[in-house]
Amino acid sequence: MELFDTETGALIVIELAMRPHNSAHWTIEGALTSQFEQHLRAVLDYPLGVTTMTAPVVVMANVLAGPADVRPASIDERVHHCLAAWPDVKIHLYGKQFRPGRKVGHVTASGPDLDVVRGRARSAARYLMNGGELP
């Protein structure tokens, strides 16, 4: 289920997906049982797994192909720098063809502090998108 949180605090249902959804890719590292495993368990009529979060805060940030990404190697080179700069951030690239603005992956960061975790995820995604600044 995809929800939007409005300025008034109301939640609006945007989409119901009866499959793993990109808005819950954070569960790969952020939950004891990912949405992918949970989906398989449900389809196979197995007991559902524990969905406890692996950290108090888990943030996923999308990686969009930047205007300079005319070849995948440019983002591949940035992955190496990103892994060194943010060793606790997990990077997932989807192997999609690169077009400016297209979602080509995501990063996930976790930890105890929302502002710190959000900053790491956004910084890593921004760097992967356009070679922004390293810490």
Where are the language model's segments positioned?
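A short glycine-rich, hydrophobically flanked beta-strand micro-motif that places a catalytic Asp/Glu
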Residues: M1-E7
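Active-site "cap" helix and flanking loop/linker of ATP-utilizing ligase/carboxylase catalytic domains
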Residues: M1, A17-D69
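Protein kinase-like catalytic core scaffold
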Residues: A10-E15
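Glycine-rich active-site loop/lid that clamps phosphate-bearing ligands
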Residues: T54-A55, V63-F98
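Short, glycine- and charge-enriched coil/turn segments that flank and shape catalytic ligand pockets
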Residues: E7-G9, A68-E77, P112-G119
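Short coil/turn motifs at beta-sheet boundaries
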Residues: G9, T54, P100-R102
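Generic C-terminus detector
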Residues: H92-P135
